């Protein structure tokens, strides 16, 4: 059944039931047309035209034409004739001297009918004088009025309003420009000034539709241009820029139209819950999340293009039109470039096309002069043109190769040259591999940025290691980085570390090959190329070892040291690792990770200096820890006999797994503890190893770990590491390293409350009821398959279990309870959260103390999959 033109509807058909049916038919027609690939620009204009007809017909039905000096005006996006399925329909009822009861009643009836039809109507009733007065004091109203478009009623009245709005007295062009620039800056800051947000807003994110609107509003105010085409005809855009903006707008409109098809209520955020369905509407398909990632890659690239055009065109408008003749004097730098104020400028109009390698010269000059903080708008425009006309990548030009290598060696290039090269599309023009990762995202909560943005942020973090003010946050890297002789090798490794993402296969392996080829083609020696290639191949090695292995096990350190081989590679790797973690997600680096990386670095450095053929003697380590702890305890007034009597209850493993400070702390409180059968809970007053340490002494019970984990989870406290052991006489000696919900150590004020809360849960209970928090909204849109892998230990006496699952509240407690139910002993846990994924390591033994046999492993796997599934149901 086809919808009818609203103008053809009779008075008897203008009832809610009939109109709702017509609106449904029209909307369904548009959805079908969208899926049949009708141009979205036609659809949004068509939708606007449909509502023009509907409102005109209702205007006639309510006899507004009988009222003199009244007209119906479309404003805002509706005024631009741009309506998406859930767009607001903003109207202005313009009237002069019509405020009587009859008029007000008609307006009320019209608006009520539109609301009853579930339309998002924004309406105002004003005179011309009121419009001007309010608009002069309200930028949003002024902007909406500027887009006013006549629908029906008194046309002359609408014309008079337009004359007033477009007069110089109503928001002069320069004032309007500055107000819109300030408005855009505030809007961009709400989105962290980046086009790369995990759940971007199609309309308001930097590079979104609002950036195109800002250009059109400013051009409309100054030139009277009402479309991108008219902006081009007015000379504000070149033909190429006009076509590019039109192409970007068309894509963003298609994404927005598809999103509105999916939603029931107005929203422009491309949330995780809707990215997959929008991708499907747009025809982006692929295995797993490939369709979403392909769509988002195109989306981010489009935002990037719009943001670049927006920035350049607004600067051109400011300099060439508003402030023509007011520019700073040019200071000549060399034959090709000059500086004007704080901007660098090409001295010849076709410099980059004639000699493409001079593009690199510009960034070398920026690195040389810290007072230059940008590129002049005409030079940006020239660069964009030259970039598009290149018939080969810049890395294929020998002169450009030499200059790029100079940039990697320049001490100031990390500060702004590389980020500017990326922002202006030069890295993509230089490296073919880089052009493939621009906009490449991963559909998860772990990677906050696209691959290209992450890599640029990594370079910036490396630069921070040369600033001594960052020593507290990055003590090892700030100590090491200034001493690294060939920093360019680290920079090249940083550029290539993720460059093969999105290709399929192991990105570390593929990137290592690319990095080696790059180094050789740029004249580096084979040993240098091998080092860079190894760094790219191994860039995850240190973080994985620190976070998912027991780095206090000498065997783990020996194995890691064998892969690193020497201190030079260790120094390069730790700088790359820390910068990589910091650049992945702003919330990822914390005191706990800093402590883990530092402990792994220091232990590996000691192993390399001692020689891998000389492993440490574990008995010496036990004696050392006992001697140091004993001295501390004697200074507190305890006798050696008391200390020895306590320690005779402990197994040798206890003295290996704890530092002498931890051992002394535990003993000091246990020796004062009057009733040894009563539980004791300690919380460290000072942050230890980057977190808060909780020590639990209690009669050992199967569910003890699960009980503590469940209670901590309920309090939004995260366990990062756990040592689970028992004394010879059956008492638990469990240590939990924890952080609060902000990834900070537990503050002192909260510590006593937490101790009381843990005592209240009755640690000696045989079973625990796991109460879980509500999972975050974003988790609902991810499906991480629960899986585990069992690995033997070097001695063969224990089993390592690598465990992966959706990081649902209550997960760790559920895992612990499952161990207890099956009679499996837990000895240690390393807890790692990677976005929506939990990737944990557990060290286990059977109920008789040996490794888990195949049958027990199978039983555990079935039970864990079943119990974890219950958490999400």
UniProtKB/Swiss-Prot annotation:
<feature type="domain" description="ACT 1">
    <location>
        <begin position="693"/>
        <end position="777"/>
    </location>
</feature>
<comment type="function">
    <text>Modifies, by uridylylation and deuridylylation, the PII regulatory proteins (GlnB and homologs), in response to the nitrogen status of the cell that GlnD senses through the glutamine level. Under low glutamine levels, catalyzes the conversion of the PII proteins and UTP to PII-UMP and PPi, while under higher glutamine levels, GlnD hydrolyzes PII-UMP to PII and UMP (deuridylylation). Thus, controls uridylylation state and activity of the PII proteins, and plays an important role in the regulation of nitrogen assimilation and metabolism.</text>
</comment>
<keyword id="KW-0677">Repeat</keyword>
<dbReference type="InterPro" id="IPR002934">
    <property type="entry name" value="Polymerase_NTP_transf_dom"/>
</dbReference>
<dbReference type="InterPro" id="IPR045865">
    <property type="entry name" value="ACT-like_dom_sf"/>
</dbReference>
<dbReference type="Pfam" id="PF01909">
    <property type="entry name" value="NTP_transf_2"/>
</dbReference>
<dbReference type="InterPro" id="IPR013546">
    <property type="entry name" value="PII_UdlTrfase/GS_AdlTrfase"/>
</dbReference>
<dbReference type="Pfam" id="PF01842">
    <property type="entry name" value="ACT"/>
</dbReference>
<feature type="domain" description="ACT 2">
    <location>
        <begin position="800"/>
        <end position="873"/>
    </location>
</feature>
<dbReference type="Pfam" id="PF01966">
    <property type="entry name" value="HD"/>
</dbReference>
<keyword id="KW-0548">Nucleotidyltransferase</keyword>
<dbReference type="InterPro" id="IPR010043">
    <property type="entry name" value="UTase/UR"/>
</dbReference>
<dbReference type="GO" id="GO:0008773">
    <property type="term" value="F:[protein-PII] uridylyltransferase activity"/>
</dbReference>
<dbReference type="GO" id="GO:0006808">
    <property type="term" value="P:regulation of nitrogen utilization"/>
</dbReference>
<dbReference type="InterPro" id="IPR006674">
    <property type="entry name" value="HD_domain"/>
</dbReference>
<dbReference type="GO" id="GO:0008081">
    <property type="term" value="F:phosphoric diester hydrolase activity"/>
</dbReference>
<feature type="domain" description="HD">
    <location>
        <begin position="451"/>
        <end position="573"/>
    </location>
</feature>
<keyword id="KW-0808">Transferase</keyword>
<feature type="region of interest" description="Uridylyltransferase">
    <location>
        <begin position="1"/>
        <end position="332"/>
    </location>
</feature>
<dbReference type="InterPro" id="IPR002912">
    <property type="entry name" value="ACT_dom"/>
</dbReference>
<keyword id="KW-0511">Multifunctional enzyme</keyword>
<dbReference type="InterPro" id="IPR003607">
    <property type="entry name" value="HD/PDEase_dom"/>
</dbReference>
<protein>
    <recommendedName>
        <fullName>Bifunctional uridylyltransferase/uridylyl-removing enzyme</fullName>
        <ecNumber>2.7.7.59</ecNumber>
        <ecNumber>3.1.4.-</ecNumber>
    </recommendedName>
</protein>
<keyword id="KW-0378">Hydrolase</keyword>
<keyword id="KW-0460">Magnesium</keyword>
<comment type="similarity">
    <text>Belongs to the GlnD family.</text>
</comment>
<dbReference type="Pfam" id="PF08335">
    <property type="entry name" value="GlnD_UR_UTase"/>
</dbReference>
<feature type="region of interest" description="Uridylyl-removing">
    <location>
        <begin position="333"/>
        <end position="692"/>
    </location>
</feature>
<dbReference type="InterPro" id="IPR043519">
    <property type="entry name" value="NT_sf"/>
</dbReference>
């Amino acid at each position: 059944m086809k919808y009818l033109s609203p103008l053809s509807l009779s008075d008897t058909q203008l009832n809610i039931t009939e109109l709702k049916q017509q609106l449904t038919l029209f909307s369904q027609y548009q959805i079908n047309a969208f899926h049949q690939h009708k141009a979205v620009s036609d659809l949004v204009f068509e939708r606007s035209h449909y509502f023009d007809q509907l409102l005109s017909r209702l205007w006639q039905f309510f006899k507004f034409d009988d009222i003199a000096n009244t007209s119906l005006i479309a404003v805002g996006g509706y005024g631009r004739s741009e309506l998406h399925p859930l767009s607001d329909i903003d109207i202005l009822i313009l009237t002069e001297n019509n405020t009587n009861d009859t008029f007000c009643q008609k307006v009320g009836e019209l608006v009520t009918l539109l609301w009853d039809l579930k339309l998002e109507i924004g309406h105002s009733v004003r005179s011309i004088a009121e419009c001007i007065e309010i608009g002069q004091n309200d930028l949003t109203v002024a902007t909406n009025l500027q887009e006013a478009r006549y629908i029906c009623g008194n046309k002359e009245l609408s014309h008079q309003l337009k004359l007033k709005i477009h007069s110089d007295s109503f928001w002069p062009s320069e004032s309007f420009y500055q107000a819109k620039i300030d408005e855009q800056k505030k809007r961009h800051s709400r989105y962290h000034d980046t086009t790369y947000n995990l759940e971007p807003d199609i309309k308001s994110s930097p590079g979104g539709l609002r950036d195109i609107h800002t250009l059109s509003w400013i051009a409309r105010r100054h030139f009277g241009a009402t479309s991108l085409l008219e902006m081009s005809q007015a000379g504000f855009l070149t033909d190429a820029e006009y076509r590019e903006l039109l192409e970007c707008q068309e894509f963003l409109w298609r994404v927005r139209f598809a999103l509105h098809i999916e939603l029931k209520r107005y929203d422009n955020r491309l949330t995780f819950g809707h990215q997959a369905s929008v991708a499907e509407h747009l025809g982006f398909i692929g295995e797993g999340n490939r369709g979403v990632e392909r769509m988002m890659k195109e989306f981010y690239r489009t935002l990037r293009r719009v943001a670049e055009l927006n920035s350049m065109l607004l600067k051109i408008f400011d300099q060439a039109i508003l402030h023509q003749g007011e520019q700073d004097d040019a200071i000549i730098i060399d034959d090709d470039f000059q500086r004007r104020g704080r901007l660098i400028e090409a001295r010849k109009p076709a410099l980059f096309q004639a000699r493409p390698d001079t593009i690199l010269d510009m960034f070398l000059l920026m690195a040389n002069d810290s007072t230059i903080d940008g590129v002049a708008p005409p030079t940006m425009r020239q660069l964009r043109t030259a970039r598009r006309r290149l018939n080969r990548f810049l890395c294929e030009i020998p002169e450009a190769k030499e200059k790029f290598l100079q940039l990697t060696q320049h001490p100031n290039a990390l500060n702004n040259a590389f980020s500017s090269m990326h922002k202006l599309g030069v890295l993509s023009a230089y490296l073919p591999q880089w052009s493939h990762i621009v906009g490449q995202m991963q559909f998860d909560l772990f990677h906050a940025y696209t691959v290209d943005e992450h890599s640029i942020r990594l370079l910036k973090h490396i630069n921070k290691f040369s600033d001594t003010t960052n020593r507290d946050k990055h003590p090892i890297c700030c100590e090491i980085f200034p001493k690294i002789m060939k920093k360019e090798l680290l920079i090249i490794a940083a550029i290539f570390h993720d460059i093969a993402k999105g290709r399929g296969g192991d990105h570390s392996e593929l990137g290592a090959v690319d990095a080696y080829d790059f180094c050789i083609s740029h004249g580096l020696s084979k040993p240098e190329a091998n080092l860079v290639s190894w760094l790219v191949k191994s860039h995850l090695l240190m973080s994985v070892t620190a976070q998912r292995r027991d780095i206090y096990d000498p065997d783990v350190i020996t194995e890691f040291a064998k892969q690193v081989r020497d201190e030079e590679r260790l120094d390069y790797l730790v700088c790359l690792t820390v910068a990589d973690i910091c650049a992945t997600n702003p919330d990822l680096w914390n005191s706990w990770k800093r402590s883990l990386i530092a402990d792994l670095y220091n232990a590996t450095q000691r192993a390399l200096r001692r020689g891998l053929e000389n492993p440490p003697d574990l008995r010496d380590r036990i004696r050392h820890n006992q001697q140091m702890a004993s001295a501390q305890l004697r200074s507190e007034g305890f006798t050696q006999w008391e200390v020895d009597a306590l320690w005779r209850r402990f197994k040798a493993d206890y003295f290996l797994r704890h530092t002498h400070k931890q051992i002394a702390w535990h003993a000091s409180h246990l020796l004062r503890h009057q009733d040894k059968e009563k539980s004791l809970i300690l919380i460290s007053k000072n942050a230890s190893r980057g977190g808060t340490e909780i020590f639990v002494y209690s009669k050992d019970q199967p569910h003890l770990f699960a009980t503590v984990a469940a209670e901590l989870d309920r309090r939004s406290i995260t366990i990062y590491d756990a040592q689970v052991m028992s004394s010879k006489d059956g008492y638990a000696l469990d240590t939990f390293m924890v952080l609060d919900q902000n990834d900070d150590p537990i503050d002192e004020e909260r510590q006593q409350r937490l101790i009381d809360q843990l005592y209240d849960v009755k640690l000696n209970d045989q079973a625990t009821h796991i109460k879980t928090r509500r999972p975050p909204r974003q988790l609902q849109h991810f499906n991480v398959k629960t899986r585990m892998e069992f690995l033997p230990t070097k001695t063969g006496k224990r089993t390592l279990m690598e465990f992966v699952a959706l990081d649902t509240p209550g997960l760790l407690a559920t895992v612990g309870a499952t161990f207890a139910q099956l009679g499996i002993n837990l000895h240690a846990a390393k807890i790692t959260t990677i976005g929506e994924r939990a990737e944990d390591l557990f060290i286990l033994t059977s109920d008789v103390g040996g490794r888990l046999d195949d049958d027990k492993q199978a039983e555990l796997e079935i039970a864990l999959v079943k119990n974890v599934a219950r958490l999400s149901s």
